[in-house]
Amino acid sequence: RDLTAATIARLNAIGIGRNDRVAIVLPNGPEMAAAFIAIGAGATTAPLNPAYRADEFNFYLTDLKAKALVVQKGVATEARDVAAKLGVAVLELVPGEHAGSFTLEGGSAAQAAQPGAAEAGDIALVLHTSGTTARPKIVPLSQANICASARHIGATLALSPADACLNIMPLFHIHGLIAAVLSSLGAGGAVICTPGFD
């Protein structure tokens, strides 16, 4: 909760609030899971595949009308340069001492239009369709949508505080974010987020 409160305050201090879209380009792991939750508690998250090329980042950041991009400090990504060219604020996630802890650096002081914690009707997450039959389209999911999905998955799997989920799924995709991370945490369980499956 401290991480979430600190993240919301940091975002609000640089003009990012509820329903403002924040693209997240981070490797799979505890920091990505924690960033999704903490940023989503006060803004709209838009996780993107870290393996995208510059032209793909250009499309997604433009289509999203992203207000900021979160990348991990010291990790190379073409997203940084693309965001700078588009005038999108680049925030660097600095991992903390413990798994999943972090701080955000960067951005300029500004007033958030809708500061504070997200409400049930606010958009928590935006994803794009696959684009197999047409140009990818944005799919917005509200706080209430993703919480209901996580609760239903947790109930279906009979998850409890005694459970631990080993997540190997990408955390820029709905299944990893909701079916693994949020459903487990929502049930009081634990999540171990690996860098991926090899």
Language-model region placement:
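Conserved structural elements of the adenylate-forming
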Residues: 1-9, 120, 139-160, 168, ...
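Conserved AMP-binding/adenylate-forming
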Residues: 7-52
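Structural core segment of the AMP-binding/adenylate-forming
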Residues: 13-14, 41-117
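Structural detector for helix-capping/boundary residues
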Residues: 14, 20, 55, 67, ...
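Conserved coil-to-alpha-helix start sites within the AMP-binding
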Residues: 26-37, 51-55, 168-186
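Conserved AMP-binding/adenylation subdomain of ANL enzymes
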Residues: 40-41, 147-164, 174-198
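Conserved pre-ATP/AMP-binding loop-to-beta segment of ANL
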Residues: 97, 109-128, 134-135, 143, ...
